[in-house]
């Protein structure tokens, strides 16, 4: 973690995220939502709903960003969850970016939905992204830079097509469960 957990700007909250966001007036620059799959009667299925994304949006500072784990994106499993989560986030946030990365623990690619109240970060040039990183980060990053951002947000055509066809919006009344 290269000292990131020691940064005074970081606060980790280990709690029921839905209940926490309902009960706090705190505002955040960045929220990272790393949750288990939405299993029926599981602890996290409400964290995939429009109601949760609305709470999340209302707790972000202007220009704030929320990144959420959004399910598998490989050709065999992407329709389970990913496009519905992205469509749900897009029903709440003005800017939603699709991203995927290989996750060794799952031996597969995994999707992430980046929701923003500000301009679309994927519209930034490689040079502008690198400049912003240099302003905010001491030392050199081993993985992330402007080229990496461009690559991570250039998802395969089948994912873009799935999102274009997607009409599901996940709600408390119409939850999404994965098998």
Where do the model's predicted regions map?
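The AdoMet/dcAdoMet-binding core of the Class I SAM-like
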Residues: 1-63, 76-82
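Hydrophobic/aromatic beta-strand patches that form the interior of the parallel beta-sheet core
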Residues: 11-13, 67, 97
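Solvent-exposed soluble domains appended to multi-pass membrane proteins
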Residues: 31, 38, 60, 72, ...
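Short "lid" loop at the C-terminus of a central beta-strand within the Rossmann-like core
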Residues: 37-38, 71-75, 103-105
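Conserved Class I S-adenosyl-L-methionine
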Residues: 53-54, 78-102, 113
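Conserved beta-strand signature within the Rossmann-like core of class I S-adenosyl-L-methionine
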Residues: 63-70
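Soluble small-group transferase modules, centered on the S-adenosyl donor enzyme superfamily
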Residues: 98-179
């Amino acid at each position: 973690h290269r000292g990131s957990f020691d940064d005074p700007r970081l606060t980790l909250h280990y709690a029921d995220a839905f209940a926490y966001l309902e009960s706090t007036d705190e505002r955040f620059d960045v929220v990272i939502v790393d949750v288990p799959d939405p299993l029926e009667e599981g602890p996290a299925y409400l964290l995939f709903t429009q109601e949760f994304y609305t709470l999340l949006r209302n707790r972000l500072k202007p220009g704030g960003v929320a990144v959420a784990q959004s399910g598998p994106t490989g050709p065999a499993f992407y329709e389970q969850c990913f496009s519905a989560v992205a469509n749900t986030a897009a029903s709440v946030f003005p800017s939603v970016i699709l991203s995927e990365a290989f996750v060794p623990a799952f031996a597969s690619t995994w999707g992430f939905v980046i929701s923003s109240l500000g301009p679309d970060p994927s519209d930034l040039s490689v040079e502008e992204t690198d400049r912003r990183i240099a302003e905010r980060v001491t030392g050199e990053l081993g993985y992330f830079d402007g080229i990496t951002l461009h690559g991570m947000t250039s998802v395969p055509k089948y994912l873009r097509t799935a999102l274009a066809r997607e009409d599901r919006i996940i709600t408390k009344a119409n939850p999404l469960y994965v098998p």
